[in-house]
């Protein structure tokens, strides 16, 4: 079996096994892979050596949440990732995929900074930024909070709004983007997110006149 469909099946299986909700499951893996491709395609002409790292970038983008501490023990998740990659990619490629997916989360970066990955440093940033770009989808944040707070849609909106104000809308201010493509695309998605947030606020307040969200 070709690696891409096998990895997508792996994401499906792992998401079911660990009750990973749709905000971090197959749809998210597909979006991060798409974003990684866009960043890579707009960066490789400046750094041709990235061509040889394309499998690492794309694979890490697909499986990055299959060791997420929110859903499982990270070490166990990485072991499962390695099982699927053994005999498909080389030892060095698998090693750097492990390093990328275990150090790219927002919380890890804020706590420990960027890791030093040598010649794979830019590959790391491409995958990390691909995930950051996907975070601008306010609907996805709503879905995550609906599944994980279990407090209803309005509270999910409040929690998602707080997350965006304190984290997502600060990506540029916090200097989390390295590549020029992500800096530009991030600004576009920033304004899309603001529009999305305001639209949901209007829908919630107008759908049921007995409720009103004060922000």
Tell me the role of every PLM-derived stretch.
Residues 47-53, 92-94:
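Short helix-terminating capping/connector loops at secondary-structure junctions
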Residues 32-37, 73-87:
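An active-site-proximal "capping" alpha-helix that borders the catalytic cofactor pocket
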Residues 1-15, 37:
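Short alpha-helical hairpin
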Residues 81-117:
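Hydrophobic, well-structured mid-protein blocks that either form specific transmembrane helices
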């Amino acid at each position: 079996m070709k690696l891409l469909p096998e990895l997508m099946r792996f994401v499906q299986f792992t998401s079911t096994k660990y009750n990973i909700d749709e905000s971090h499951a197959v749809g998210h893996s597909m979006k991060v892979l798409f974003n990684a491709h866009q960043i890579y395609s707009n960066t490789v002409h400046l750094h041709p050596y990235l061509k040889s790292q394309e499998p690492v970038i794309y694979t890490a983008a697909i499986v990055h949440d299959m060791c997420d501490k929110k859903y499982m023990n990270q070490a166990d998740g990485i072991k499962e990732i390695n099982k699927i990659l053994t005999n498909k990619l080389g030892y060095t490629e698998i090693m750097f995929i492990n390093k990328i997916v275990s150090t790219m989360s927002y919380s890890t970066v804020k706590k420990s900074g960027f890791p030093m990955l040598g010649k794979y440093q830019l590959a790391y940033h491409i995958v990390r930024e691909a995930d950051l770009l996907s975070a601008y989808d306010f609907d996805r944040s709503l879905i995550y909070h609906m599944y994980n707070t279990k407090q209803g849609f309005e509270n999910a909106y409040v929690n998602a709004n707080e997350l965006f104000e304190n984290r997502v809308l600060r990506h540029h201010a916090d200097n989390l983007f390295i590549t020029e493509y992500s800096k530009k695309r991030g600004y576009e998605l920033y304004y899309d997110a603001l529009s999305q947030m305001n639209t949901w606020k209007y829908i919630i307040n107008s759908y049921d006149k007995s409720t009103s969200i004060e922000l």
